[in-house]
Amino acid sequence: MTKIYDAANWSKHEDDFTQMFYNQNVKQFWLPEEIALNGDLLTWKYLGKNEQDTYMKVLAGLTLLDTEQGNTGMPIVAEHVDGHQRKAVLNFMAMMENAVHAKSYSNIFMTLAPTETINEVFEWVKQNKYLQKKAQMIVGLYKAIQKDDEISLFKAMVASVYLESFLFYSGFYYPLYFYGQGKLMQSGEIINLILRDEAIHGVYVGLLAQEIYNKQTEEKKAELREFAIDLLNQLYENELEYTEDLYDQVGLSHDVKKFIRYNANKALMNLGFDPYFEEEDINPIVLNGLNTKTKSHDFFSMKGNGYKKATVEPLKDDDFYFEDEKEQI
């Protein structure tokens, strides 16, 4: 039988939220070249050897995860999701992961470090067993998706939400730690822009996962929740070791582990599950770095949150009131 091909009809909503996510993704689109990084050089020269080493490695680890999410994760999930608009949003997000986020880290490297050091840190990525393990676990679930199988797709979506809303944050911690102290500010602006993107990526894929989950029997729901918690624990145990490997030399492992647990709970909430870890106080310096309200900076030195594109507006809780959005439509 000849296959009938249909076109994407953007004049008709596929659901209550996808076009809103499309609009938000487009509104906050940015490019690495829009952020000048030379202003970080003076601070960088005064950092200790261990501080520079940890900073380079956390960004290299983030680069690997963004590369795999852009090249493998989002495209595979998009392939198995129904709906042209949903596929478009996922593919837009995939583009941001590698072409924008990963490239941004390379721009930071090229500004702060010589070629030899950059090559060494990318070799470290291939050799670090904890980093490789989490990449293997996540990518393995992407590649395990079976055609017309919602359960394997749900599991891959859980992995995607964990990557975007949980695993990235051991790497985000250190740039935010400096940013919250007013150091390495240009690099910190890039991290805040990436955080803004990852926030909506995690929420969107989480909503798609919840659709699948909510269609299941109570017995199947229990099984899927058990899978999600088991995967969380496996990733968490590996993340603890990864954190010690990176942050022991700068004395911040204890703080980073709190931040990891905080974001693991956020990832679970994106999936519609209750928090798993107890609530803890997060380092106020890092929370200050996470404050994405508009900052007053010189127009020509920074883009980030202090630079106003005509079409960009900061992400707010109101952006996720889907019922209100539907009524307006």
From Swiss-Prot:
PANTHER family membership: RIBONUCLEOSIDE-DIPHOSPHATE REDUCTASE SMALL CHAIN, RIBONUCLEOSIDE-DIPHOSPHATE REDUCTASE SUBUNIT M2
Keyword tags: Deoxyribonucleotide synthesis, Iron, Metal-binding, Oxidoreductase
Cofactor(s) named in the record: Fe cation
Pfam families per the UniProt record, alphabetical: Ribonuc_red_sm
Top-level taxon of origin: Bacteria
Subunit structure: Tetramer of two alpha and two beta subunits.
Molecular function in Gene Ontology: metal ion binding; ribonucleoside-diphosphate reductase activity, thioredoxin disulfide as acceptor
Binding site for Fe cation 2: 97, 164, 198, 201
Family, as annotated: Belongs to the ribonucleoside diphosphate reductase small chain family.
Reaction it catalyzes: a 2'-deoxyribonucleoside 5'-diphosphate + [thioredoxin]-disulfide + H2O = a ribonucleoside 5'-diphosphate + [thioredoxin]-dithiol
EC number: 1.17.4.1
Protein name in UniProt: Ribonucleoside-diphosphate reductase subunit beta
Disruption phenotype: Essential, at least the last 3 genes of the locus cannot be deleted; could be due to polar effects on downstream ymaB.
Active site (catalytic residues): 105
One GO term of the biological process aspect: deoxyribonucleotide biosynthetic process
Chain residues that bind Fe cation 1: 66, 97, 101
Function, in words: Provides the precursors necessary for DNA synthesis. Catalyzes the biosynthesis of deoxyribonucleotides from the corresponding ribonucleotides.
